[in-house]
Amino acid sequence: MDKKATRLRRARRARAKIAELKVHRLSVHRTPRHMYAQIIAPDGGRTLVAASTVEKDLRSRAEGTGNCSAAAEVGRLIAERAKAAGVERVAFDRSGFKYHGRVKTLADAAREAGLQF
């Protein structure tokens, strides 16, 4: 198995466990250049809020888009948007990525901004 296939296998297992909880899911995706985060409804059918480093206002604020400071901005932004949408408690879906570096920074920033997981 290659690296992507093993990551996707880990993600599938985690998502199955999160689906049993019936809570909103904070899904994170990272590429070498960007970070993406979205909050998905418990039924898995729709995205309630999203934030990423692709957004114009976030690109202008951060020094680059593929680093920890940009990931922290995405974490703060997704938490603010989630609270505005009435979501305070989520399950963290790291999409099979290691809980380290940018993924951990995004999660910590979202927690500091008031999201509970």
Curated annotation (Swiss-Prot):
Taxonomic placement: Bacteria, Pseudomonadati, Pseudomonadota, Gammaproteobacteria, Chromatiales
GO BP: any one term: translation
Gene Ontology cellular component annotations, sorted alphabetically: cytosolic large ribosomal subunit
Family membership: Belongs to the universal ribosomal protein uL18 family.
InterPro entries xref list: Ribosomal_uL18_bac-type, Ribosomal_uL18_bac/euk
Protein name per its UniProtKB record: Large ribosomal subunit protein uL18
A Pfam family that the UniProt record links to this protein: Ribosomal_L18p
Keywords: Ribonucleoprotein, Ribosomal protein, RNA-binding, rRNA-binding
Quaternary structure annotation from Swiss-Prot or TrEMBL: Part of the 50S ribosomal subunit; part of the 5S rRNA/L5/L18/L25 subcomplex. Contacts the 5S and 23S rRNAs.
HAMAP family: Ribosomal_uL18_B
Molecular function (Gene Ontology), one example: structural constituent of ribosome
Summary of the function given for this chain in its UniProt record: This is one of the proteins that bind and probably mediate the attachment of the 5S RNA into the large ribosomal subunit, where it forms part of the central protuberance.
Gene3D superfamilies: 3.30.420.100
